[in-house]
Amino acid sequence: MSVEPGKWGVIYNPKAGTRKVQKRWKEIKEYMDSKGVSYDYVQSEGFGSVERLAGILANNGYRTIVVVGGDGALNDAINGIMSSNAEKKEEIAIGIIPNGIGNDFARYWELNLEYKLSLIHISE
């Protein structure tokens, strides 16, 4: 399958965090739409699905994969990309929009937890 260049594959993990996280996902989608971000999104459904979905996105040719979730979802997505059959895996950009409970990865790397700024950084 060929994906239009520049189109993001977005994985939303609704299990990360609380009900507030689900409301925030709606805001994130609306913001991406208002900024003209070209993306397809998939929603994880349970244990192991983020890893599987990231592998599918990589195999389908997405060059930017964005995780909307927490530390566990980010880890699973990286594992999914690396275990995929995608060519040039090292050229796949992975982005994180922190949307979990702890977001330790984002805090350690001083990534802003505000999704609008995260989206700006990913776009660059």
Q: How would you label these PLM feature ranges?
A:
Residues 80, 108-109:
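Residue-level signal for well-ordered alpha-helical positions
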Residues 73-86:
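Short Gly/Thr/Asp-enriched flexible loops that form oxyanion-binding sites at enzyme active sites
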Residues 58-59, 84, 111-114:
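Short, hinge-like loop/turn segments at secondary-structure boundaries
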Residues 117-124:
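Residue-level detector of conserved catalytic or cofactor/ligand-binding positions
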Residues 52, 76, 104-105:
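Phosphate- and divalent-cation-binding pockets in alpha/beta enzyme and binding domains
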Residues 70-73, 99-101:
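Short glycine-rich anion-binding loops that position phosphate/pyrophosphate groups of nucleotides
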Residues 86-108, 116:
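Short, acidic/small-residue loops that bind anionic groups at enzyme active sites
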Residues 1-68, 79, 116:
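ATP/NTP phosphate-donor binding region
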